[in-house]
Regions:
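C-terminal terminal-subdomain/extension
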Residues: 2-3, 8, 72-124
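Short, charged beta-turn/beta-strand-edge "cap" motif at the junction between a beta-strand
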Residues: 21-25
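Compact nucleic-acid interaction/catalytic patches
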Residues: 26-30, 36-72
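A structural motif
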Residues: 34-35, 51, 84, 110
Length: 124
């Protein structure tokens, strides 16, 4: 991502406003906040990054692959849910602006939800 000629490297745990369009089918759509999941070394050298979309439209109880992020954490203006079942690789050109960063306790919840989403742990 370029800003005034300066290259900016997203870091794991940061929230960015991301343009997800165009999409196909049930993929998450429109410009919305997303959580950077990719490690910092890859974020420094790769033109792509891995993100999880956020939504402010959710119902409780949450699924095991969802993590609640309450205002003002991450620079969000409304309570939102990280959708760890909507993990996606994107070109960094889709990153619009940095909103904030998650607290370590929330990142731990995200890590657990990723493990569940990818089948790396048993739910039982």
């Amino acid at each position: 991502m370029l800003s005034k000629g300066k290259i900016i490297y997203p870091q794991r745990g940061e929230i960015y406003l991301v343009n997800f369009d165009p999409t196909i089918g049930s993929e998450i759509k429109k410009t919305r906040p997303a959580l950077i999941l990719q490690n910092d070394v890859s974020n420094q050298y790769s033109p792509i990054t891995i993100v999880a979309a956020l939504t402010s439209q959710f119902t409780e109880p949450l699924y095991p692959t969802e993590v609640l992020i309450k205002v003002p954490e991450g620079g969000l203006q409304v309570d939102s849910v990280a959708l760890l079942n909507q993990i996606r690789s994107i070109d960094k050109q889709r990153l619009i602006k940095r909103l904030g960063v998650l607290e370590s306790v929330t990142i731990e919840q995200v890590d657990r939800a990723i493990q569940i989403s990818l089948g790396l742990v048993n739910l039982i």
